[in-house]
């Protein structure tokens, strides 16, 4: 029951945080570039549907985000195992056999649930922070803040295609967070083993 409450809390918190970043991004975009000439969203640039397209794109993105958050925090149930070795645990939950560990998990899993949950959790955790970078960019442009820090910041941003440092950080961040998810799930597994031992 406690796990369900925590899962629902994390679901609502992450969805609220991401919705807030979407609203701020759209608001600051409108203030900074009402004609969307400065808009750098690669999907928008390919379609050029104006504000209707940009808002629709954000709605679709948010629906996808909700689906990922729901799977990561509510739908996914951690498998029950007796494995106390992380490699054997990963092999068991992904391939159905504790003896078939695959380094760096390059082989496609037999059980897709853990991989999907790991991906969803990582993306859901990293996206609001990456989206805030865009909000910060618009904010600094609107206020025309000019100092050494903003010069360094925008110089770094300019190094990325279309200035989309957020996409780069989202990919790197999600990759790093996948290891955090694995460690978190393994610790949960060890706690459950201990709990079952104490009950017997």
Question: Where does each model-flagged region fall?
Answer:
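Hydrophobic alpha-helical segments at protein termini of multi-pass membrane proteins
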Residues: 2-200
């Amino acid at each position: 029951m406690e796990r369900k409450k925590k899962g629902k809390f994390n679901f609502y918190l992450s969805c609220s945080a991401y919705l807030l970043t979407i609203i701020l991004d759209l608001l600051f975009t409108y203030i900074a570039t009402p004609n969307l000439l400065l808009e750098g969203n690669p999907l928008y640039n390919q379609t050029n549907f104006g504000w209707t397209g940009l808002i629709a794109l954000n709605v679709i993105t948010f629906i996808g985000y909700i689906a990922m958050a729901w799977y990561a925090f509510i739908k996914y149930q951690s498998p029950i195992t007796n494995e106390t070795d992380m490699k054997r645990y990963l092999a068991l939950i992904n391939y159905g056999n504790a003896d078939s560990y695959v380094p760096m998990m390059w082989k496609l899993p037999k059980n897709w649930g853990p991989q999907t949950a790991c991906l969803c959790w990582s993306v859901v955790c990293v996206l609001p922070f990456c989206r805030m970078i865009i909000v910060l960019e618009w904010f600094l442009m609107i206020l025309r803040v000019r100092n050494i820090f903003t010069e360094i910041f925008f110089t770094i941003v300019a190094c990325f295609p279309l200035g989309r440092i957020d996409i780069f950080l989202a990919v790197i961040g999600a990759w790093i967070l996948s290891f955090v998810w694995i460690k978190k799930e393994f610790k949960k597994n060890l706690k459950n083993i201990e709990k079952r031992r104490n009950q017997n």
